[in-house]
């Protein structure tokens, strides 16, 4: 069935890396709502910076936390309003009104399914199944004007940008086949040290030492000694198992135990980069 409205979901911690460069071309001519999910994991200053940047591009952003339900009602109302606008245009062309069909799109693991579940829980009435190409697709009526497809569309992440690939890995937004936890954790520790000097990132000075009671030293050649830090942290916390410590560090970030951290800020704001290499996946 033809889709009229696309609800694009991105990860609020990495809004650029979870935006697909070809999406605007794919959805040309359709209404578009941009959602930044996991707002609770990003500092308010970073949210304000991103909102201002998107506003300057003529794009309204809907900040949500699908897990807690924050911002979901406002998103639902915005989608229903978009449906009403589209039907007003149809009426102006002498066409009969019909429920507008909306599809939710986004990279893997950015929270599309959780968001759909939140929206569906607030549904007004459930509509009938309509045959899809390969399986039955269920449409859920969210208002008099709007039907939402209850299966999310998945955009393929592109790993040709190594810094974006690292951020996707850190946020658990790409498959683990593309990276190893130890390498990702070492890059993350290095990135955290660099982010200490970036306003609005949410990274406090000495974050790793404060959290794990292990100081992050400097290499003689310059730069943080992340391998030495990981080995010492493993001795203290995981019985000397570096891989388990690496996994713990990544999990602590992904579960917000390190606090709210923005890994990306709007274009024009200098952000640090670290040397990484990821496998390229076909898109």
Q: How should these model regions be labeled?
A:
Residues 27-28, 55, 120:
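Short conserved AdoMet
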Residues 33, 39-106, 124:
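Canonical P-loop GTPase G-domain recognition
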Residues 74, 78, 114, 187-190, ...:
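Alpha-helical scaffold segments in soluble metabolic enzymes
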Residues 95-97, 118-119, 140-141:
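Solvent-exposed alpha-helices and their adjacent loops that cap or buttress functional pockets
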Residues 1-6, 13-33, 39, 45, ...:
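Helix-rich effector regions associated with P-loop NTPase G domains
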Residues 101-121, 125, 151:
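Glycine-rich phosphate-binding P-loop
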